[in-house]
Structure formats: C-alpha cells, structure tokens
C-alpha cells in the first residue's frame, strides 16, 4: 500500500513565496521562474510590471497604457484597483524599486 498523501504538498501562497525566496538566495530565481511560468505567462508578468510602472508614473491614462502595452483596459483597471488597496509605504517602496530597476 502506498502512503502517498492524497493532497498537494504546496497549498498556501506563502509556500510559493518562500520557494521563490529560497531560489533567489541560491541565485536560481531565473531558473525557478522559467520552470513555473510558460513563455506566455512570463510575457503577461512583464506586462503587469509595466502596468504598475505606468500607473505609478501617473503620466498616461489607462486607455493610453492599454494602447502602449497591448493589453485590455480591464487589465489596467485591475492593476489600478490593486494599487489603491496598498499603503503609502508600499507604494513608495514599489516606486523606488521600479526606479532602481530602470537604471
């Protein structure tokens, strides 16, 4: 008889975050993300980063961001709504992080 559990070993979002954190510590974050995400999903993630960047920048309308990035306005709106739920400290941290990565 097998003693293999009938449930998934990874059931919480925090476990995924911890897995990514450990991969980063081992300088294998790129490998892990490529294993977890298809090329299309990586492109979608890139679009999401650009959406956050454009929303934080505040110089373009959601419609213009949609046209620039080739994503639906609803996707931009979801990103905007998520940002609205974040603290000012989180928004400042994100703005700083995005600015550092741009350089």
Curated annotation (Swiss-Prot):
GO terms for biological process: negative regulation of DNA-templated transcription. Residues 62-85 bind DNA. Coiled coil: none annotated. The keyword Repressor applies. Belongs to the TrpR family. Homodimer. This protein is an aporepressor. When complexed with L-tryptophan it binds the operator region of the trp operon and prevents the initiation of transcription. GO terms for molecular function: DNA-binding transcription factor activity; sequence-specific DNA binding. The keyword Membrane does not apply. It comes from the Bacteria. The lineage of its organism: Bacteria, Pseudomonadati, Pseudomonadota, Gammaproteobacteria, Vibrionales. This is Trp operon repressor homolog. Keywords: Cytoplasm, DNA-binding, Repressor, Transcription, Transcription regulation. InterPro entries: Trp_repress, Trp_repress_bac, Trp_repressor/repl_initiator, TrpR-like_sf. GO terms for cellular component: cytoplasm. Gene3D superfamilies: TrpR-like. It is found in: Cytoplasm.
């Amino acid at each position: 008889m097998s003693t293999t559990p009938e449930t998934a070993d990874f059931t919480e979002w925090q476990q995924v975050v911890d897995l990514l954190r450990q991969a980063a510590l081992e300088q294998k974050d790129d490998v892990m993300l490529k294993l977890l995400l298809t090329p299309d999903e990586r492109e979608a993630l890139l679009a999401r980063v650009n959406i956050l960047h454009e929303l934080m920048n505040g110089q373009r309308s959601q419609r213009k961001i949609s046209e620039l990035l080739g994503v639906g306005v609803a996707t931009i709106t979801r990103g905007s709504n998520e940002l609205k739920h974040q603290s000012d400290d989180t928004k400042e941290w994100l703005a700083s992080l995005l600015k550092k990565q741009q350089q």
